[in-house]
Amino acid sequence: MLGFLNLHKPTGMTSHDCVGKVRRICGLKRVGHGGTLDPLATGVLPIALGPATRLLHYLPDQKTYQATIQFGLTTTTDDLAGDILSEQSANHLAQEVVEKALPQFLGSIEQRPPAYSAIQVKGQRLYDLARQGKDVTAPLRQVEVFDIQILDWQGGEKSELQVEIACGPGTYIRSIARDLGEVLGTGATLAQLTRTLSCGFALADSLTFETLAEQVQAGTFSPLEPSFSLQQPILHLPPAEAQRFCWGQKLPQDCADGMMQVHDTSDRFLGMGEIIDGLLKPKVVLPAQ
């Protein structure tokens, strides 16, 4: 089995848990995911099956989330899973004030990941250090936020803002919620998170575990072809050159430099190659299917 699964991750499971469950359902050992989702989050979790795990690095890295941010509350994890650090009324907040604060979170920004996160400091993950009671400050990281759109606003003691955020890899929506609360002086935490787009996969096309299991049992499950989500240009090779590519040999090509999807003339996906100075160098060669 080779290809991708657009999994609809349920709440309450880690991304690692999801990989394990897919292994059991599909009867595969080689399974990987294309970007961690917090246990409380739901939505798109790209899954690579078999040798397609070698292609995860080449998938598009933009992500889109729908998030609900609750004001007047801060927690140890920057979401509702953590212990409460502070509470106050946020009924004085107006949507217009919140809206004016959002542009500072756009573009290339410095962001501090949550204390409970998978970021490593001196070889240890922050969530392990936090559970040990160690007070470690996460290092600042540069991330990209392309767009923030307000979807809904509910005023009150714990005012809530629903937004859609398009961002690059490594962006923590929990950190945006926390930092927005600090800017507005009320504190805030992430109340709900759904990833609607990741690695080129959309939520509307995702499969639940239940649907996946039904399809596997019925023999109707078919992984998505690599080219479904890869966005690099396609280079078609004639039979002799395709064979040489599969042997790992460099090939002269009169094309612009860059990463390419490599296909044969029957449009069978062979792998990924990079053209540098007129030479195609195989980067990933997949086994014949």
UniProtKB/Swiss-Prot annotation:
Protein's recorded name: tRNA pseudouridine synthase B
Keyword Isomerase: yes
Function, as annotated: Responsible for synthesis of pseudouridine from uracil-55 in the psi GC loop of transfer RNAs.
EC number per UniProt: 5.4.99.25
Taxonomy, superkingdom: Bacteria
Keyword Isomerase: yes
Catalytic-site annotation from UniProt: 38 (nucleophile)
GO molecular function: RNA binding; tRNA pseudouridine(55) synthase activity
The reaction(s) this protein catalyses: uridine(55) in tRNA = pseudouridine(55) in tRNA
EC class: isomerase
GO biological process, one term: mRNA pseudouridine synthesis
PANTHER family: PSEUDOURIDYLATE SYNTHASE TRUB1 (PTHR13767:SF2), TRNA-PSEUDOURIDINE SYNTHASE (PTHR13767)
